[in-house]
């Protein structure tokens, strides 16, 4: 079984959507490290005098041979209208941009803190958006691909899909 950090009881996870994903990731075999609600702080650009920006990856999955995978989880029933994402009547940030931004912020931090001895070209990395509550049949934006998107239909096999 995968190791979780922090190791929490699923019922203590505030958002049901993240709880569902946390439970599904419990099916990952040993060797995986799953970081939940992983915060990061980075300069806006790679300049030291730039303002800092904060972010949080819903899940970061690490494996010594398979690399790094960032999961962005969106509950409810997100839908794309034109070029804008909505959850109900409320506009929301593009989940695919969020996942990508989280991944690159983490990769930048790893490179920086390792003094460039660990470079992103040395391991596989990616990001995936998960809609655990809904079966999404709408269009996907051009900045993504169906292979990096999972909805409620994939939840029962989520761990197996990630382990592939």
Map each language-model feature to its residues:
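Intrinsically disordered, low-complexity Ser/Thr/Pro/Gly-rich regulatory segments
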Residues: 1-164
């Amino acid at each position: 079984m995968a190791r979780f950090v922090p190791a929490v009881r699923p019922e203590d996870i505030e958002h049901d959507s993240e709880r569902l994903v946390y439970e599904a990731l419990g099916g990952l075999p040993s060797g995986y490290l799953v970081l939940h609600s992983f915060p990061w702080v980075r300069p806006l650009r790679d300049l030291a005098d730039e303002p800092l920006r904060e972010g949080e990856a819903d899940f970061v999955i690490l494996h010594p041979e398979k690399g790094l995978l960032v999961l962005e989880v969106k509950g409810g029933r997100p839908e794309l209208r034109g070029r804008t994402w909505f959850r109900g009547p409320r506009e929301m940030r593009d989940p695919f941009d969020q996942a990508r931004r989280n991944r690159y912020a983490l990769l930048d931090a790893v490179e920086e803190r390792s003094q460039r001895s660990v470079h992103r070209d040395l391991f596989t990395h990616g990001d995936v958006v998960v809609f655990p509550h809904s079966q999404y049949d709408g269009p996907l934006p051009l900045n993504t691909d169906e292979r990096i998107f999972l909805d409620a239909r994939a939840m029962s096999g989520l761990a197996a899909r990630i382990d592939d």
